[in-house]
Amino acid sequence: MMAKNKEPRPPSYTVSVVGLSGTEKDKGNCGVGKSCLCNRFVRSKADEYYPEHTSVLSTIDFGGRVVNNDHFLYWGDITQNGEDGVECKIHVIEQTEFIDDQTFLPHRSTNLQPYIKRAAASKLQSAEKLMYICTDQLGLEQDFEQKQMPEGKLNVDGFLLCIDVSQGCNRKFDDQLKFVNNLFVQLSKSKKPVIIAATKCDECVDHYLREVQAFASNKKNLLVVETSARFNVNIETCFTALVQMLDKTRGKPKIIPYLDAYKTQRQLVVTATDKFEKLVQTVRDYHATWKTVSNKLKNHPDYEEYINLEGTRKARNTFSKHIEQLKQEHIRKRREEYISTLPRAFNTLLPDLEEIEHLNWLEALKLMEKRADFQLCFVVLEKTPWDETDHIDKINDRRIPFDLLSTLEAEKVYQNHVQHLISEKRRIEMKEKFKKTLEKIQFISPGQPWEEVMCFVMEDEAFKYITEADSKEVYGRHQREIVEKAKEEFQEMLFEHSELFYDLDLNATPSSDKMSEIHTVLSEEPRYKALQKLAPDRESLLLKHIGFVYHPTKETCLSGQYCTDIKVENLLATSLLEMDHNRVRLYHDSTNIDKVNLFILGKDGLAQELANEIRTQSTDDEYALDGKIYELDLRPVDAKSPYILSQLWTAAFKPHGCFCVFNSIESLSFIGEFIGKIRTEASQIRKDKYMTNLPFTLILANQRDSISKNLPILRHQGQQLANKLQCPFVDVPTGTYPRKFNESQIKQALRGVLESVKHNLDVVSPVPINKDVSEADLRIVMCAMCGDPFSVDLILSPFLDSHSCSAAQAGQNNSLMLDKIIGEKRRRIQITILSYHSSIGVRKDELVHGYILVYSAKRKASMGMLRAFLSEVQDTIPVQLVAVTDSQADFFENEAIKELMTEGEHIATEITAKFTALYSLSQYHRQTEVFTLFFSDVLEKKNMIENSYLSDNTRESTHQSEDVFLPSPRDCFPYNNYPDSDDDTEAPPPYSPIGDDVQLLPTPSDRSRYRLDLEGNEYPVHSTPNCHDHERNHKVPPPIKPKPVVPKTNVKKLDPNLLKTIEAGIGKNPRKQTSRVPLAHPEDMDSSDNYVEPLDTIFKQKGYSDEIYVVPDDSQNRIIKIRNSFVNNTQGDEENGFSDRTSKGHGERRPSKYKYKSKTLFSKAKSYYRRTHSDASDDEAFTTSKTKRKGRHRGSEEDPLLSPVETWKGGIDNPAITSDQEVDDKKIKKKTHKVKEDKKQKKKTKTFNPPTRRNWESNYFGMPLQDLVTAEKPIPLFVEKCVEFIEDTGLCTEGLYRVSGNKTDQDNIQKQFDQDHNINLASMEVTVNAVAGALKAFFADLPDPLIPYSLHPELLEAAKIPDKTERFHALKEIVKKFHPVNYDVFRYVITHLNRVSQQNKINLMTADNLSICFWPTLMRPDFENREFLSTTKIHQSVVETFIQQCQFFFYNGEIVETANTVAPPPTSNPGQLVESMVPLQLPPPLQPQLIQPQLQTDPLGII
């Protein structure tokens, strides 16, 4: 049963493949293809097919289990399905003959028969014989599949006779055919079927094949199958046909010729290849690997089919080709991208056609490599070419490989770039030409359409050249420009007509009549008509302006972020914060005042005498003062000491104060010069912040022999110098003393020093103190217009550069506080800086003691805004007008500026205000002295202003407060000695923007503060301090007449010659002399009207009386008590609510407005307000002004009187333009007061604190030049580093050496150099200007100037030589007299400056400009010396000559011809100095006294 159920086993056949075998002699170099035929049939997959099989084996391999010492191979079996579906198993045996690799003879085996007989054997036996796979299997059987021959024996069922029909290898086909014939004979004996396989038909030789076919025909029609194992053609057919012969039940196979079978097979391969390639093309990343892709595709049928037919190796090759194609495609795209990017790179690196137009490609490449942006556009690879590096994978790196430029494509792009630049240049030229054509067409108006203009330019060459789009673009740009310009001019016009808008209250709405008036006035303006075609825009601008006028805020300001209020707040926020930090550092430096260091300066042994006197009064250098012991360290220095400046300030000795003692005009002159030098040096180099506050005290030594003759002059000149320098003056006490110095003098001076130190500590206290505004003595409002062409730093620098400047009350971001000595006391002044639009509300609602009105002399709108604002200011409030421009030369060169400056000064003259011009290119505006006289005037009118303000606010009230501000307790200090700001005492600028015509004589405004004594000397008007000072400050002192001066019996008359000089000077002055004491002896004076006539003008309740103390100049020092009785208010009292504090000249009137005092202001108002004001009302308004001003206005003339001492005694406070007409007017209304002679009660003026530059100790800077150089290195290392840095990085910097660098950076450069002389300035990231400033500071720090003082006179004389060649040779000989060290450094510096001047077209620094900036540093001038001031221009021209003729002076070169060579100035006689100093050469706006005499007595023209 079981046997029946078993499935029948498929039939099994054994086929023996035979053919020519044997040694190489028998078969040639290669076999006939038996092994390949078997391999392809048994293992048909391409990866399992091995084309190479060898029959030469070693003995070991022959004895292995695969060969097993037999000459046949067992290839295994394969199960085959027939066409009828019947399976059969075919075992394949290959009969061969193995050759020994040693003897090259057949191996000996168990069967010793020859191959022909062995091959015909039908029974084969070999125990444990393994299946053969390939040659590599031999000896490594364990690494391959191990399959044994079934049962170790097989019976052969048929033979497959292989005949090679190819050309063969060293084998004759006839020999093969003969061998085959013999073999066939043996095979026939076995009675087994035989089929002939014609092998290697892919290399078939046709006649060989025909012979095989003939052979088969002769042998009982043997079947011949044409095969090719390489291409797998008809291999299976051979075995199938043989099986069919064995099993007749199977269908007879169809034998296909080789060519037909090959085509069929190749078609199958091609189809599989196409499918595989499509499969491979799905891979898009050329970074993909075969391993990754094959793992993904191994189960895909198309992949498997191709692998079976062609094999993995071909599949990998196909994949590699595809990947390479992807890579090349990527490289191609990158190359195209680079080529497309090249034009942009060329535009970046080679934009200038003139530079590259004539360069070839290689030269252009070299030029590109030098560009700073080269690395941004190109990358230079270490390995080339670029497409074989990993750069192709850097997708994010868009830089072009530089080696790509070596291709022809890149060169072609470059040529196209050049051509594009040429055409673009032509196109731009034609567009600009067309633009100029449009600009020449006058009738093109804003808003005019292109169509209306096009017909007028049709024939224009440029229009024809450019495209229509370009034409429209150019016209659109032209329209935008003219529209924008028209709108700006329209807006500027609105500001110029500010009087038309600023007549209504804030937050008001203009009426229709007002709008009609505005349009009527503006319609006459061309700038109004210019926007005719843009009427909606014009109306919008007008409404926007009106909205801003009536609702002015920072947010609505038409200047936006450039609003003055915003700029001021930002500047104050940063400046005051930095100032606080500096004060904290200064506070910590000023610690111990138990020990006082005093520097004593004198001449002819005076300093040592004073030091001896102080030591006499001390005990072991300890001095008792006011119950406290102070250790004194005295440092007396005589004027003759050559190292006087270096001794003043050393690391071991830092003085708390300086006593300057004098006993003659000569010694006083020396003191003035010395202090001027110190202050000049301190302001230029700023050695230490502490030195800025160093107090000076002038001490007059007693003269026992000639007290009656010289003492009054010395006292007057000493006091005058002290006032000028803002420092205390210690006079000789009254009485006779045996010694030169009195104990009271020393104590008074020492107290002053201690008070100054104490005040400095209070000023720089790190504890922030926000004092209430009510504590400010004065409140000043500075107004500036938004959009003016100057920085707010220019107008704020006089305050911010002062050490006494501090922040105002919290919340007042636009205010600052200034501590300044005004009159006899230190005052706190609140400065509020506002735009004009913000000031309107302040003007109407808040108490203001004075206005500083700033305007730009370059802008009419600025003057218009000033006029509109000033017109509504009450005429009781002092005003200072400030015109701002670049330089004094603008007045000469620009008529518009000249007109505006003249108008400003004219208005100031009309309203008796002050007028000042500030120049942005000058440094003088950084001194608060610009406003000193104005502050004094404001203080004088303070009470009147406050009462006027109080009256306006409480006009309906019957009760008035006596004082507006509470008195400040500090006004009662018995001793007021405070250091003034840096600016109040800063020396005049080293040079003037125009030249050397500096006014050295005191102006009338300055002289009004002095009166003449009996001997013709001017005395400052001041009084003795007492505890009631605050009452006299805040109450109105009645005008008094001084009692007759009682002559002292011991006063001697002046030298008659001096007296005649003074009288002659006064006689030349046409001013009234009633304001001065007559030039007569005391006994000749009339005393009939010399008593006080008090008028108390402070309004009080009826019946109220008070006592006010006044201090007339009484020689007996008596205090006169005056009772003031108040009666019922007059009509004026009732009308104004108060009684005017001024003298009868002012009358009892209500305050008016400035527009009624100025013809200029009123004429403007009249032209605008003609719709609302009649002519009669205008005349009436002016009538009142006329009656009050009649006879008061007069011109001022220069007083030719010169003080017998130096120029600083003339009261020169401001070289800027200043007009002080009102001070002169006061001389008519007030009687002068004589100075009290009692110096014990004299007020102390503030001390001078020269600013310092360096605030650290240095072993390098400030040292003598000889200590900083060696024979090997004659140039100081610091100078060398600075010059190299400047020449390497900033030679073309605009304004080099003129534009100031950052002060902190300059200090850091020197500090870092102090620590490490090898520093690299480039690594410090500092600006060129900072390095230039540090270089100038180095020379300013030197103990002696680089150009020695001893050679200054010789240089001066040589510069006056008329002949240029002779002058240059004389200067050259003087330079040779320099110390060798100075000569080397001077040559180095001048050579550097010459290089700088050579770049003047870029840096704008000509030799002239450089000499202006450098000559004060190189020559260290004494600006307090009158003779030196008169020669400043000569010294500057000498330095300019050195710079221009550098090659001639130092390198034996030729004289260079220059266009602006400065001719030698005419020689001046020192005796004629007065005439040369009279400022007649300056224009009227710059010297007001030249205009005022030409004005009518009544400037308004009413009479």
Curated annotation (Swiss-Prot):
InterPro entries: FF_domain, FF_domain_sf, P-loop_NTPase, pG1, Rho-GAP_domain, Rho_GTPase_activation_prot, RhoGAP-FF1, RhoGAP_dom
GO cellular component terms attached to this protein's record: cytosol; endoplasmic reticulum; plasma membrane
Biased composition (Pro residues): 1036-1045
All copies of domain FF, residue ranges: 267-325, 366-420, 427-481, 482-548
GO terms (BP aspect): cell migration; epithelial cell migration; mammary gland development; positive regulation of epithelial cell migration; positive regulation of mesenchymal cell proliferation; regulation of cell size; signal transduction
Occurrences of domain pG1 pseudoGTPase (ranges): 590-763
Subcellular location: Cytoplasm; Cell membrane
Region (Disordered): 975-1004, 1022-1050, 1069-1091, 1129-1157, 1169-1255
Modified residues annotated as 3'-nitrotyrosine in this record: Y550
PTM sites of type Phosphoserine: S590, S765, S951, S968, S1115, S1196, S1203, S1219
Keyword Transcription: no
Signal sequence bounds: none
Record's compositionally biased regions (Basic and acidic residues): 1141-1151
Keywords on record: Cell membrane, Cytoplasm, GTPase activation, Membrane, Nitration, Phosphoprotein, Repeat
Sites marked Arginine finger: R1298
Cited function: GTPase-activating protein for Rho family members.
Domain comment in the entry: The pG1 pseudoGTPase domain does not bind GTP.
Subunit and interaction comment: May interact with RASA1/p120GAP.
Protein name stated in the entry: Rho GTPase-activating protein 5
Originating organism: Mus musculus (Mouse)
Source species taxonomy: Eukaryota, Metazoa, Chordata, Craniata, Vertebrata
Gene: Arhgap5
